[in-house]
C-alpha cells in the first residue's frame, strides 16, 4: 500500500548561495544548505515539499526526528514535520499557508560524496484512513508520539518563526513576524458585491495578486518586489469605489484599476 508517498528521483541537496534562493517557477524561496547529514537533509526535504503549498515568498519548516534507520546507502528518517509559508501582508511577515504537525517518513540515498538524495516522502492519508496509514508507516513503539503529533506543533512553529526572522535579517528588513492569522480589514460592501469581487479575483491574473481585504500584500516577481494594494473610497455621487494598485517599493504605480459598485457588482471605471 502506498501511503501519501512522493518520489524524488534527482533531488539532491547541495550548497548554493549564502542568501535565500528564489525559485522562479513557484516564486517561493528558502536557504539551501549542503546536506551531508540527516538533520539537514530532512530540513531541506520538508522545504522542497513546501513548494506544493503555493506561490509565496519564503518557505520555512519545523521537524522532530524520532529515529533513523540505515541499510547500506539508504537512510530512513521517522519524523514529525511541518511547513510554514510566509509573505508580507499589511507590512507583517505572516504565515499564509502550510501544514500542522504531520507524521512523515523520508527515505534518502547517500552518494559517494556523502550527499543525501531524497527518494521518497511519505505522509499519512486523510480522513478515516489516517490512523491506519500512520501505523503502517511507523514502528509501533512510536504510536504514542505520531498518533498525537499535534502536541509537537508549538515546537515546530517556533522553529518556523526563527527561520522567518533569520530570512528578514538576511534581506535587511525589519518587520513583525506572525505565525498565526492576522486579522484583516474587510471591504465595506454588500455580500453580493463581495462575492462578485472574489469571482473577479480568481479569473484575472492581475486581480488575483491583489488583496481581498483593505490593505497590502507583497509579491516577488522575477526578483523584483512589488506591493499590491486594495483600497476603498467614495465617488462624488456617494457610490463606493474600489481601487487596486500594483506598485514598486518606492510607491511608483505600475498598474491600477478602479471599480464602482453598481447593483451589487463591480463596474470598471478606470
Where are these regions (language model features)?
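Short, non-transmembrane alpha-helical segments in secretory-pathway proteins
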Residues: 29-58, 176, 180-223
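A short, structured loop/turn motif at beta-sheet edges
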Residues: 66-78, 107-117
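A short hydrophobic beta-strand element
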Residues: 73-89, 238-244
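Short, cysteine-centered beta-strand-loop-beta hairpins and adjacent loop/turn segments enriched
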Residues: 83-100, 248-256
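A short, surface-exposed interaction/processing loop segment used at functional sites
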Residues: 101-131, 247-270
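A eukaryote-biased signal for long
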Residues: 191-270
